[in-house]
Regions:
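Carbohydrate-associated surface elements
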Residues: 170, 192
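A short helix/loop element that forms part of the nucleotide-sugar donor recognition site in Leloir-type
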Residues: 200-215, 220
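Aromatic "clamp/platform" in nucleotide-sugar-dependent glycosyltransferases that forms part
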Residues: 307
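Short hydrophobic beta-strand element within catalytic cores of glycosyltransferases
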Residues: 324-327, 337
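Conserved acidic donor-binding segment of nucleotide-sugar-dependent glycosyltransferases
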Residues: 339-340, 344-351, 360-365
Length: 407
């Protein structure tokens, strides 16, 4: 029986608001999944690198769920330099785990945590569960290559993990095809959504709550995510131009992220200006997660033009709110968006095609309503309690079998 879990989240904390810096869907994933596990009786400590000297060493989020801040390098260290502090992070986690003494398994999130988890597995003789969230070789296929060091590290962690979590069948296929992962160790555990917040609601009321954005009476397109090239905001902006609807508004919720974030924000601002869309684009700062439901409800269509997406939590949250989604046909978005039933999938990155799909929804109220109803119905099948139940079975199984040897 699983008693206590050590969750590794080196580069980003579940306490940080998603949508800014390196905080995004992974923050939501770790926070919501660990919360659901705690409510199901599995205690968990989430270990993350201290990024703010004012943060206490231990924060109790709720009974059974704590966040432990580990000293590992300068607090303002850029993400590209985090590989240099993995060993210091692992040292700090090791010290805490020796004091706890009753940890049953490690669960690493993202490749950096996986490297630390790989070391700790051997030092502490504990099973290692890995969730990668993004994969270097998948990003390389979209023209966004990562350093070879990351590729090698991911391959090593995949070879040594006792269980590898995939959010959807597409990610499982990528793990097998690109990394030779043992299919017997891949576990399909889709994330969930908090239906207490993300559910259909009154569009007029939502727009009234966002009156500061001056949305007007025309259609509203929504983009939610960190502003970085991977997320494809430029496609959404160009699609707005191609739509040729002066009464349409594109709302962008998110902030600069990663080494290219500031440059991408400037590039998007210049693109908006060049296309003459300044009056039609509204930029909103990253929002507290539960507040995003108001934005989803206010929108006619949510646009998700990512270059790659292991799962696509934004698409799921929009669906749960009954908002049709037009998304790139990549990764987990192929699973979340049922083409022609809950929205549209777009092959390739042609803004004209995105615009045509958005226009089809805007021009047909009956189609939009049908998409929204079916999206909300399907969204109900994704809950964090279900994800936690699946994960508990994975953890329990690991406690009864020998550890996987490194390959």
């Amino acid at each position: 029986m699983m008693r206590r879990l050590a969750v590794l989240s080196l580069h980003t904390s579940p306490l940080v608001q998603p949508g800014q810096g390196d905080s995004g869907g992974m923050n939501v994933y770790v926070r919501e999944l660990v919360s659901a596990l705690a409510q199901a009786g599995v205690q968990a400590d989430v270990f993350t690198r201290r990024w703010d000297e004012a943060s206490p060493e231990v924060v109790e989020v709720e009974p059974g769920f704590r966040v432990v801040h580990v000293e590992a390098g300068p607090h303002d260290l850029a993400k590209e330099h985090l590989p240099e502090v993995v060993d210091a992070f692992a040292d700090g986690v090791h010290k805490h785990l020796e004091q706890l003494g009753d940890v049953d398994a490690l669960h690493a999130n993202y490749w950096l945590s996986g490297v630390a988890g790989h070391r700790l597995k051997h030092e502490l003789d504990l099973p290692l569960v890995s969730t990668f969230h993004t994969l270097a070789r998948v990003k390389a296929e979209t023209g966004d290559p990562e350093p070879e060091r990351r590729v090698r590290a991911e391959a090593q962690v995949i070879g040594c993990s006792d269980a590898i979590l995939a959010s959807c069948g597409a990610e499982a296929d990528q793990l097998e095809r690109l990394y030779g992962a043992d299919p017997g160790r891949i576990e399909l555990v889709p994330p969930g959504v908090d239906h207490a917040f993300f559910s259909p609601g009154d569009r007029a009321g939502a727009r009234a709550a966002l009156r500061h954005l001056r949305l007007g009476d025309g259609p509203v397109l929504l983009f939610v995510g960190r502003i970085q090239p991977l997320k494809g905001l430029d496609v959404a902006v160009r699609a707005l131009a191609a739509l040729q609807r002066p009464d349409a508004t594109l709302v962008v919720v998110g902030g600069a992220s990663g080494a290219e974030g500031a440059e991408e924000v400037a590039r998007i601002a210049a693109l908006v200006d060049d296309l003459g869309l300044t009056a039609q684009v509204r930029m909103a700062d990253p929002q507290p997660h539960h507040m995003l439901s108001t934005y989803y409800r206010a929108a006619d269509v949510c646009v998700v033009p990512s270059r790659s997406e292991s799962f696509g939590l934004v698409a799921l949250e929009a669906a749960a709110c009954g908002t049709p989604v037009v998304a790139a046909a990549v990764g987990g978005l192929r699973t979340l968006v049922v083409d022609g039933r809950t929205g549209f999938l777009v092959e390739g990155r042609d803004p004209e095609v995105f615009a045509a799909r958005v226009d089809a929804i805007l021009r047909d109220d009956a189609l939009a309503a049908a998409f929204g109803t079916e999206a909300a119905r399907r969204g109900k099948g994704y809950t964090w309690s279900t994800a936690a139940a699946r994960l508990r079975r994975v953890y329990s199984d690991l406690t009864t079998r020998a550890l996987v040897d490194c390959q």
